Protein backbone atom coordinates (compact mmCIF):
# COMPACT_ATOMS: atom_id res chain seq x y z
CA UNK A 1 0.00 0.00 0.00
CA UNK A 2 2.86 2.35 0.90
CA UNK A 3 4.55 1.57 -2.45
CA UNK A 4 1.34 2.32 -4.32
CA UNK A 5 1.02 5.65 -2.51
CA UNK A 6 4.63 6.55 -3.37
CA UNK A 7 4.05 5.60 -7.02
CA UNK A 8 1.00 7.85 -7.24
CA UNK A 9 2.93 10.67 -5.55
CA UNK A 10 5.83 10.34 -8.01
CA UNK A 11 3.50 10.30 -11.03
CA UNK A 12 1.71 13.36 -9.71
CA UNK A 13 5.00 15.17 -9.08
CA UNK A 14 6.30 14.40 -12.58
CA UNK A 15 2.96 15.46 -14.03
CA UNK A 16 3.17 18.79 -12.21
CA UNK A 17 6.67 19.40 -13.56
CA UNK A 18 5.55 18.61 -17.10
CA UNK A 19 2.50 20.86 -16.69
CA UNK A 20 4.74 23.78 -15.76
CA UNK A 21 6.82 23.22 -18.86
CA UNK A 22 3.73 22.97 -21.05
CA UNK A 23 2.33 26.23 -19.70
CA UNK A 24 5.49 28.05 -20.80
CA UNK A 25 5.48 26.77 -24.34
CA UNK A 26 1.91 26.18 -25.49
CA UNK A 27 -0.28 29.03 -26.74
CA UNK A 28 -2.75 30.61 -24.37
CA UNK A 29 -6.34 29.52 -24.83
CA UNK A 30 -7.56 33.11 -24.50
CA UNK A 31 -7.66 34.89 -27.84
CA UNK A 32 -9.20 37.98 -29.37
CA UNK A 33 -8.99 39.08 -32.99
CA UNK A 34 -8.44 42.68 -34.03
CA UNK A 35 -11.68 43.96 -35.51
CA UNK A 36 -11.25 45.11 -39.11
CA UNK A 37 -14.25 46.44 -41.03
CA UNK A 38 -12.68 46.93 -44.45
CA UNK A 39 -9.00 45.93 -44.66
CA UNK A 40 -8.27 42.43 -45.94
CA UNK A 41 -4.49 42.56 -46.17
CA UNK A 42 -3.64 41.85 -42.55
CA UNK A 43 -4.98 40.26 -39.39
CA UNK A 44 -3.96 40.28 -35.73
CA UNK A 45 -4.85 37.75 -33.05
CA UNK A 46 -4.05 38.55 -29.41
CA UNK A 47 -3.44 35.44 -27.29
CA UNK A 48 -2.77 37.40 -24.10
CA UNK A 49 0.88 36.42 -23.77
CA UNK A 50 1.68 37.25 -27.39
CA UNK A 51 0.14 38.41 -30.68
CA UNK A 52 0.22 36.90 -34.15
CA UNK A 53 0.29 39.35 -37.07
CA UNK A 54 -0.35 38.02 -40.57
CA UNK A 55 0.16 39.96 -43.79
CA UNK A 56 -1.81 38.63 -46.74
CA UNK A 57 -0.99 39.50 -50.36
CA UNK A 58 1.20 42.58 -49.81
CA UNK A 59 1.49 42.99 -53.58
CA UNK A 60 -0.68 41.93 -56.53
CA UNK A 61 -0.75 38.16 -57.17
CA UNK A 62 1.26 37.49 -54.01
CA UNK A 63 0.58 33.93 -52.86
CA UNK A 64 2.44 33.93 -49.55
CA UNK A 65 1.05 34.88 -46.16
CA UNK A 66 3.71 36.36 -43.86
CA UNK A 67 3.42 35.51 -40.16
CA UNK A 68 4.99 37.53 -37.34
CA UNK A 69 5.14 36.85 -33.61
CA UNK A 70 4.77 40.01 -31.52
CA UNK A 71 6.09 39.96 -27.95
CA UNK A 72 6.69 42.53 -25.23
CA UNK A 73 10.26 42.83 -23.91
CA UNK A 74 9.29 40.89 -20.80
CA UNK A 75 7.69 38.12 -22.83
CA UNK A 76 10.65 37.96 -25.20
CA UNK A 77 13.05 37.34 -22.28
CA UNK A 78 11.27 34.11 -21.29
CA UNK A 79 10.03 33.08 -24.72
CA UNK A 80 10.62 29.51 -25.88
CA UNK A 81 9.11 30.01 -29.34
CA UNK A 82 10.90 28.57 -32.36
CA UNK A 83 12.09 31.41 -34.61
CA UNK A 84 11.83 29.19 -37.67
CA UNK A 85 8.04 29.07 -37.26
CA UNK A 86 7.72 32.78 -38.09
CA UNK A 87 8.94 35.22 -40.69
CA UNK A 88 10.16 37.33 -37.78
CA UNK A 89 9.77 37.75 -34.03
CA UNK A 90 9.21 41.41 -33.16
CA UNK A 91 9.40 43.11 -29.79
CA UNK A 92 6.65 45.67 -29.16
CA UNK A 93 6.09 48.50 -28.64
CA UNK A 94 8.47 49.61 -31.38
CA UNK A 95 10.95 52.20 -30.15
CA UNK A 96 12.90 52.81 -33.38
CA UNK A 97 11.37 52.34 -36.82
CA UNK A 98 12.23 52.87 -40.48
CA UNK A 99 9.36 53.21 -42.95
CA UNK A 100 9.86 53.36 -46.70
CA UNK A 101 6.77 55.09 -48.10
CA UNK A 102 5.42 58.55 -47.32
CA UNK A 103 2.00 56.88 -46.98
CA UNK A 104 3.24 55.28 -43.74
CA UNK A 105 4.11 58.60 -42.10
CA UNK A 106 0.61 59.98 -41.32
CA UNK A 107 -0.22 56.94 -39.18
CA UNK A 108 2.88 57.55 -37.07
CA UNK A 109 1.95 61.20 -36.66
CA UNK A 110 -1.71 60.54 -35.84
CA UNK A 111 -0.64 58.02 -33.19
CA UNK A 112 1.88 60.47 -31.74
CA UNK A 113 4.91 58.25 -32.38
CA UNK A 114 6.60 60.14 -35.22
CA UNK A 115 9.65 60.62 -32.96
CA UNK A 116 10.37 56.88 -33.27
CA UNK A 117 11.11 57.31 -36.99
CA UNK A 118 14.91 57.24 -37.35
CA UNK A 119 15.41 56.86 -41.10
CA UNK A 120 13.59 57.31 -44.40
CA UNK A 121 14.55 56.84 -48.07
CA UNK A 122 13.93 60.07 -49.99
CA UNK A 123 13.33 62.59 -47.21
CA UNK A 124 12.63 65.41 -49.69
CA UNK A 125 9.33 63.70 -50.53
CA UNK A 126 8.09 64.11 -46.94
CA UNK A 127 5.49 66.88 -46.53
CA UNK A 128 4.49 66.58 -42.85
CA UNK A 129 5.67 69.65 -40.95
CA UNK A 130 6.31 67.65 -37.78
CA UNK A 131 8.38 65.04 -39.56
CA UNK A 132 10.18 67.66 -41.65
CA UNK A 133 11.21 69.25 -38.35
CA UNK A 134 12.74 65.95 -37.26
CA UNK A 135 14.51 65.65 -40.61
CA UNK A 136 15.87 69.19 -40.40
CA UNK A 137 17.25 68.55 -36.90
CA UNK A 138 18.98 65.35 -38.11
CA UNK A 139 16.81 63.09 -35.96
CA UNK A 140 15.72 61.25 -39.10
CA UNK A 141 18.52 60.09 -41.41
CA UNK A 142 18.39 60.03 -45.21
CA UNK A 143 18.51 56.44 -46.48
CA UNK A 144 18.66 57.01 -50.24
CA UNK A 145 16.04 55.41 -52.51
CA UNK A 146 13.60 52.59 -51.74
CA UNK A 147 15.10 50.14 -54.26
CA UNK A 148 18.62 51.05 -53.20
CA UNK A 149 18.43 51.86 -49.50
CA UNK A 150 21.78 52.72 -47.93
CA UNK A 151 22.08 49.58 -45.82
CA UNK A 152 25.24 50.82 -44.11
CA UNK A 153 23.38 53.78 -42.61
CA UNK A 154 20.33 51.65 -41.82
CA UNK A 155 22.37 49.01 -39.99
CA UNK A 156 24.07 51.78 -38.05
CA UNK A 157 20.65 53.07 -36.97
CA UNK A 158 19.70 49.52 -35.91
CA UNK A 159 15.91 50.03 -35.91
CA UNK A 160 13.58 47.56 -34.22
CA UNK A 161 11.67 47.22 -37.47
CA UNK A 162 11.65 48.23 -41.13
CA UNK A 163 8.22 48.64 -42.74
CA UNK A 164 8.63 48.20 -46.48
CA UNK A 165 6.50 47.76 -49.55
CA UNK A 166 7.11 45.88 -52.76
CA UNK A 167 5.60 45.28 -56.16
CA UNK A 168 6.77 41.67 -56.39
CA UNK A 169 8.76 40.76 -53.28
CA UNK A 170 12.10 40.76 -55.08
CA UNK A 171 13.89 43.43 -53.09
CA UNK A 172 17.51 42.45 -52.47
CA UNK A 173 17.98 45.31 -50.02
CA UNK A 174 15.22 44.03 -47.75
CA UNK A 175 16.74 40.54 -47.87
CA UNK A 176 20.09 41.99 -46.76
CA UNK A 177 18.39 43.83 -43.91
CA UNK A 178 16.59 40.68 -42.76
CA UNK A 179 19.82 38.66 -42.82
CA UNK A 180 21.37 41.24 -40.50
CA UNK A 181 18.72 40.43 -37.88
CA UNK A 182 16.45 43.44 -38.41
CA UNK A 183 12.86 42.37 -39.14
CA UNK A 184 11.12 43.65 -42.27
CA UNK A 185 7.33 43.75 -42.68
CA UNK A 186 5.71 44.44 -46.04
CA UNK A 187 2.87 46.95 -45.76
CA UNK A 188 0.13 46.13 -48.26
CA UNK A 189 -2.22 49.08 -47.75
CA UNK A 190 -1.82 50.10 -51.39
CA UNK A 191 -3.25 46.76 -52.59
CA UNK A 192 -6.57 47.23 -50.77
CA UNK A 193 -9.61 47.78 -52.98
CA UNK A 194 -11.37 50.65 -51.20
CA UNK A 195 -10.41 54.00 -49.66
CA UNK A 196 -11.55 53.02 -46.16
CA UNK A 197 -9.74 49.68 -46.36
CA UNK A 198 -6.50 51.53 -47.06
CA UNK A 199 -7.12 53.96 -44.21
CA UNK A 200 -7.78 51.11 -41.77
CA UNK A 201 -4.10 50.14 -41.93
CA UNK A 202 -3.55 52.69 -39.17
CA UNK A 203 -4.61 49.78 -36.93
CA UNK A 204 -1.56 47.86 -38.20
CA UNK A 205 0.66 50.58 -36.77
CA UNK A 206 -1.51 50.74 -33.65
CA UNK A 207 -0.63 47.11 -32.88
CA UNK A 208 3.09 47.70 -33.42
CA UNK A 209 3.13 50.61 -30.98
CA UNK A 210 0.68 49.18 -28.41
CA UNK A 211 -1.80 51.89 -29.37
CA UNK A 212 -4.66 49.70 -30.54
CA UNK A 213 -7.40 51.73 -28.84
CA UNK A 214 -6.02 55.02 -30.17
CA UNK A 215 -5.79 53.67 -33.73
CA UNK A 216 -9.33 52.34 -33.52
CA UNK A 217 -10.65 55.70 -32.30
CA UNK A 218 -8.81 57.63 -35.03
CA UNK A 219 -10.07 55.33 -37.77
CA UNK A 220 -13.64 55.45 -36.46
CA UNK A 221 -13.60 59.25 -36.77
CA UNK A 222 -12.17 59.09 -40.31
CA UNK A 223 -14.83 56.53 -41.25
CA UNK A 224 -17.62 58.66 -39.75
CA UNK A 225 -16.48 61.79 -41.56
CA UNK A 226 -16.20 59.85 -44.83
CA UNK A 227 -19.64 58.30 -44.56
CA UNK A 228 -21.21 61.61 -43.49
CA UNK A 229 -19.72 63.30 -46.57
CA UNK A 230 -20.92 60.44 -48.79
CA UNK A 231 -24.44 60.75 -47.37
CA UNK A 232 -24.44 64.49 -48.02
CA UNK A 233 -23.35 64.00 -51.65
CA UNK A 234 -25.99 61.34 -52.22
CA UNK A 235 -28.74 63.97 -51.93
CA UNK A 236 -27.78 65.90 -55.06
CA UNK A 237 -29.64 65.21 -58.28
CA UNK A 238 -27.23 66.78 -60.78
CA UNK A 239 -24.09 64.77 -61.45
CA UNK A 240 -21.26 66.43 -63.39
CA UNK A 241 -19.47 64.18 -65.87
CA UNK A 242 -15.84 63.55 -64.94
CA UNK A 243 -12.68 62.63 -66.87
CA UNK A 244 -9.43 61.64 -65.17
CA UNK A 245 -5.78 60.96 -65.98
CA UNK A 246 -3.68 61.92 -68.99
CA UNK A 247 -1.37 60.55 -71.68
CA UNK A 248 1.97 58.91 -70.96
CA UNK A 249 3.77 58.46 -74.26
CA UNK A 250 1.00 57.05 -76.48
CA UNK A 251 -1.28 55.70 -73.74
CA UNK A 252 -3.95 57.46 -71.65
CA UNK A 253 -3.97 56.01 -68.13
CA UNK A 254 -7.01 56.48 -65.90
CA UNK A 255 -8.68 54.62 -63.00
CA UNK A 256 -10.79 51.59 -63.80
CA UNK A 257 -14.32 51.52 -62.44
CA UNK A 258 -13.55 49.14 -59.57
CA UNK A 259 -10.51 51.03 -58.26
CA UNK A 260 -10.39 52.96 -54.96
CA UNK A 261 -10.10 56.18 -56.99
CA UNK A 262 -13.31 55.37 -58.85
CA UNK A 263 -14.96 54.51 -55.52
CA UNK A 264 -14.18 58.02 -54.30
CA UNK A 265 -15.80 59.49 -57.40
CA UNK A 266 -18.82 57.24 -56.95
CA UNK A 267 -19.16 58.29 -53.31
CA UNK A 268 -18.87 61.93 -54.38
CA UNK A 269 -21.94 61.18 -56.54
CA UNK A 270 -20.52 62.17 -59.91
CA UNK A 271 -20.80 60.64 -63.36
CA UNK A 272 -17.36 59.14 -63.80
CA UNK A 273 -17.30 58.26 -67.48
CA UNK A 274 -15.46 54.99 -66.93
CA UNK A 275 -17.36 53.79 -63.87
CA UNK A 276 -18.62 50.67 -65.67
CA UNK A 277 -15.14 49.30 -66.44
CA UNK A 278 -13.57 46.52 -64.37
CA UNK A 279 -10.21 44.89 -63.86
CA UNK A 280 -7.01 45.41 -61.92
CA UNK A 281 -4.66 48.33 -62.38
CA UNK A 282 -5.31 51.38 -64.52
CA UNK A 283 -7.13 51.52 -67.82
CA UNK A 284 -4.74 52.02 -70.74
CA UNK A 285 -6.55 53.67 -73.65
CA UNK A 286 -5.78 55.54 -76.85
CA UNK A 287 -6.21 59.29 -77.08
CA UNK A 288 -8.86 58.85 -79.76
CA UNK A 289 -11.08 56.63 -77.62
CA UNK A 290 -10.86 58.97 -74.62
CA UNK A 291 -11.53 62.04 -76.75
CA UNK A 292 -14.57 60.46 -78.32
CA UNK A 293 -16.04 59.56 -74.93
CA UNK A 294 -14.93 62.49 -72.77
CA UNK A 295 -14.62 65.54 -75.03
CA UNK A 296 -17.67 67.13 -73.39
CA UNK A 297 -16.86 66.12 -69.79
CA UNK A 298 -17.75 68.84 -67.28
CA UNK A 299 -14.65 68.29 -65.14
CA UNK A 300 -11.17 66.88 -65.61
CA UNK A 301 -9.49 65.64 -62.44
CA UNK A 302 -5.87 64.65 -61.79
CA UNK A 303 -4.32 65.15 -65.25
CA UNK A 304 -1.20 63.19 -64.32
CA UNK A 305 1.70 65.35 -63.05
CA UNK A 306 0.78 68.47 -65.06
CA UNK A 307 0.49 71.54 -62.85
CA UNK A 308 -0.69 74.19 -65.33
CA UNK A 309 -2.75 74.66 -68.48
CA UNK A 310 0.42 75.78 -70.23
CA UNK A 311 2.26 72.56 -69.33
CA UNK A 312 -0.72 70.48 -70.42
CA UNK A 313 -0.91 72.25 -73.78
CA UNK A 314 2.83 71.93 -74.37
CA UNK A 315 2.64 68.20 -73.70
CA UNK A 316 -0.13 67.67 -76.25
CA UNK A 317 -2.02 70.38 -78.10
CA UNK A 318 -4.95 68.01 -78.53
CA UNK A 319 -5.73 68.43 -74.81
CA UNK A 320 -7.01 71.92 -75.64
CA UNK A 321 -9.92 70.41 -77.58
CA UNK A 322 -11.59 69.08 -74.41
CA UNK A 323 -14.42 71.23 -73.05
CA UNK A 324 -12.92 70.99 -69.55
CA UNK A 325 -9.74 72.61 -70.87
CA UNK A 326 -11.65 75.34 -72.69
CA UNK A 327 -13.77 76.06 -69.59
CA UNK A 328 -10.78 75.93 -67.23
CA UNK A 329 -12.43 73.14 -65.25
CA UNK A 330 -9.35 71.03 -64.52
CA UNK A 331 -8.22 70.25 -60.97
CA UNK A 332 -5.04 68.68 -59.65
CA UNK A 333 -3.41 67.74 -56.36
CA UNK A 334 0.19 68.11 -57.57
CA UNK A 335 0.35 71.81 -56.65
CA UNK A 336 -0.19 71.14 -52.94
CA UNK A 337 3.30 70.33 -51.69
CA UNK A 338 5.50 70.30 -48.63
CA UNK A 339 8.51 72.53 -48.03
CA UNK A 340 10.81 70.39 -50.19
CA UNK A 341 8.36 69.57 -52.96
CA UNK A 342 6.72 66.39 -51.71
CA UNK A 343 3.11 66.07 -52.92
CA UNK A 344 0.84 66.07 -49.86
CA UNK A 345 -1.83 63.92 -51.53
CA UNK A 346 0.60 61.04 -52.05
CA UNK A 347 1.53 61.16 -48.37
CA UNK A 348 -1.76 61.84 -46.59
CA UNK A 349 -4.48 60.85 -49.06
CA UNK A 350 -4.33 57.14 -48.22
CA UNK A 351 -4.83 57.70 -44.50
CA UNK A 352 -7.38 60.50 -44.87
CA UNK A 353 -9.87 59.49 -47.60
CA UNK A 354 -12.44 61.63 -45.80
CA UNK A 355 -10.49 64.74 -46.83
CA UNK A 356 -10.10 63.48 -50.40
CA UNK A 357 -13.84 62.85 -50.64
CA UNK A 358 -14.69 66.28 -49.26
CA UNK A 359 -12.34 67.85 -51.81
CA UNK A 360 -14.13 66.05 -54.63
CA UNK A 361 -17.56 67.01 -53.31
CA UNK A 362 -16.48 70.66 -53.02
CA UNK A 363 -15.29 70.64 -56.64
CA UNK A 364 -18.16 68.65 -58.13
CA UNK A 365 -21.00 70.02 -55.99
CA UNK A 366 -19.90 73.52 -54.93
CA UNK A 367 -23.29 74.18 -53.33
CA UNK A 368 -22.40 71.62 -50.64
CA UNK A 369 -19.76 72.06 -47.91
CA UNK A 370 -19.89 75.82 -48.42
CA UNK A 371 -17.35 76.63 -45.70
CA UNK A 372 -14.95 73.83 -46.63
CA UNK A 373 -11.60 74.64 -48.22
CA UNK A 374 -10.12 71.82 -50.35
CA UNK A 375 -7.16 70.17 -48.68
CA UNK A 376 -5.39 68.62 -51.67
CA UNK A 377 -7.03 69.66 -54.95
CA UNK A 378 -6.61 73.05 -56.60
CA UNK A 379 -7.57 74.41 -60.02
CA UNK A 380 -4.80 73.89 -62.55
CA UNK A 381 -2.52 76.94 -62.68
CA UNK A 382 -3.37 79.31 -65.53
Task: List each model region and its residues.
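Extracytoplasmic substrate-binding proteins
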Residues: 139, 160-163, 170-251, 275-276, ...
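Solvent-exposed, polar/charged alpha-helical surfaces in well-ordered, non-transmembrane soluble domains
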Residues: 95, 105-109, 152-156, 175, ...
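A short, gly/pro- and small-residue-rich
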Residues: 114-117, 176-188, 312-331
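Bacterial Sec-exported substrate-binding components of ABC uptake systems
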Residues: 16-105, 214-243, 309, 326, ...
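A short, structured surface patch at a secondary-structure boundary
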Residues: 60-155, 161-166
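Structural recognition of the beta-strand scaffold that forms the well-ordered cores
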Residues: 96-99, 116-120, 161-165, 184-187, ...
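Flexible, glycine-rich surface segments
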Residues: 229-316
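Bacterial Sec-dependent N-terminal signal peptides
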Residues: 1-22
Amino acid sequence: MKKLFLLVLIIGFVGCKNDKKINRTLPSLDRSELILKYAKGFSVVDYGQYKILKINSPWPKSEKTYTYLLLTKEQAMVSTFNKDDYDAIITIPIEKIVVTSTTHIPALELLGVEQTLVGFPGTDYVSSEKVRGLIDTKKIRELGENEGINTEVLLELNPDLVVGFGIDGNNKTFETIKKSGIPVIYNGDWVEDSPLAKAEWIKFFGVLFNKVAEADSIFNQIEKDYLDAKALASKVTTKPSVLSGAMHKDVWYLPNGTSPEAQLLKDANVNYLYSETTGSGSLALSFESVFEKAKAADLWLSPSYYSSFEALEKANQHYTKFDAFKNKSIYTFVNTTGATGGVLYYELGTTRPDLVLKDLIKICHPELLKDYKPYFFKPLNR
